[in-house]
Curated annotation (Swiss-Prot):
Coiled coil: none annotated. Pathway: Cofactor biosynthesis; NAD(+) biosynthesis; NAD(+) from nicotinamide D-ribonucleotide: step 1/1. It comes from Sulfolobus acidocaldarius (strain ATCC 33909 / DSM 639 / JCM 8929 / NBRC 15157 / NCIMB 11770). Gene3D superfamilies: HUPs (3.40.50.620). It catalyses: beta-nicotinamide D-ribonucleotide + ATP + H(+) = diphosphate + NAD(+). Keywords: ATP-binding, Cytoplasm, NAD, Nucleotide-binding, Nucleotidyltransferase, Pyridine nucleotide biosynthesis, Transferase. One of its GO terms (biological process) is NAD biosynthetic process. HAMAP family: NMN_adenylyltr (MF_00243). One of its GO terms (cellular component) is cytoplasm. It is found in: Cytoplasm. This is Nicotinamide-nucleotide adenylyltransferase 1. Its main location: cytoplasm. GO terms for molecular function: ATP binding; nicotinamide-nucleotide adenylyltransferase activity.
Length: 175
């Protein structure tokens, strides 16, 4: 069976990596769909789809995951219930089940007739992209403990940490 694991991965962190390992223990193949591909350079979505694709691929390679069992692709989407699932169907290879921790994705997929499974949360209080972006914004280096080494290095190489601090400044923040 082939599972679809959609997410924004802003950034891809160790919790996501644990989910990928968990899924590959249960399914023959895994499709990782990088959602909101049209979004970047904002506090909620600081990284481009291409940057996130690199983060995911390098994390899996770093961990020794057989990339022949994984398809990774970004998708631009309109998140209305009916449109989202149709867009996924247009861009994704065939899948048998959708795996998500997002209640809206779970509900939309189920209502569209797909087999769905809730993804387990691995240390969500620590491995949480919102928390990681906040740590980066606050220049707290603990964020690097929450992501694979390749992601930490990639974010620093592209100055993604600086980008997050820049895009979260408001009009009242001093330079």
């Amino acid at each position: 069976m082939r599972a679809l694991f959609p997410g924004r991965f802003q950034p891809f962190h160790l919790g996501h990596l644990q989910v990928v390992k968990w899924l590959l223990d249960r399914y023959e193949e895994l499709i990782i769909m990088i959602g909101s591909g049209q979004e970047s350079h904002s506090p909620y979505n600081p990284f481009t789809a291409g940057e996130r694709l690199v983060m995911v691929k390098e994390s899996l390679a770093e961990t020794g995951i057989d990339l022949r069992k994984v398809v990774i692709f970004p998708v631009m989407e309109s998140f209305t219930s009916k449109n989202w699932i149709r867009i996924v169907e247009m861009y994704s290879p065939h899948f048998d089940v959708i795996i998500s921790g997002n209640p809206l994705v779970y509900t939309v997929a189920k209502e569209a007739g797909y087999m769905v499974e809730r993804v387990p949360m691995f240390n969500r209080d620590i491995y949480n992209a919102t928390r990681i972006r906040k740590l980066i914004m606050e220049n707290d280096l603990k964020w690097m403990e929450c992501v694979p080494k390749s992601v930490s290095q990639f974010i620093r190489d592209i100055k993604g940490d600086e980008r997050i601090r820049d895009v979260t400044k408001n009009d009242y923040t001093e330079d």
